Amino acid sequence: MSPNRIMRMLQAAIVADAFGVPYEFKQRGTYTVAPEMVGGGFWEQAPGTWSDDTALTLALLDHLTHADSYAKLMDRLTAYMETGAYTPTGQLFDIGNACAKAIRTYVIEQAEPTMCGDPSEFANGNGALMCLAPLAVALYAEPRFVTRAKSYRAYTQMTHRHPRAVLGSVIYLETLWQLLH
């Protein structure tokens, strides 16, 4: 896969996220979508500001680029939560409950990174899905589904350990992987 294709995909995801920030937490049908980048919204952010979705995706990309340990990725997620790393302004304005809980579990309990996610039935939001798309790209050349699925599972469990969340990630990431081929 060419670096240009990867960059275009990343840029599209970041722009789409920034377009969506002003509409977070709004009920469908209660607003008009602007045809240009606007600010405001629940978080009162400047136009073009991306959300935790992109920030955590950038943290994962940083991790994958350096090919380092799961602990190093959790350190990056911690830096996002504590210092606003990977944000356009250097300030965190949102983080999902399950992701925040997983980071606290890692920091406070010093848990194994792939065991930090909440295993409860109620920890089944899209928090894992929102940032894991780069895994499909990173595993582009991996021909074995079992190997890919193990990786999808490990990364998902860092923030979401319920089997439903893991299965959702496997289906989502494998669909992306298939689309890339």
Language model features: what each stretch is:
Residues 1-181:
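Structured, active/binding-site neighborhoods that engage oxygen-rich ligands
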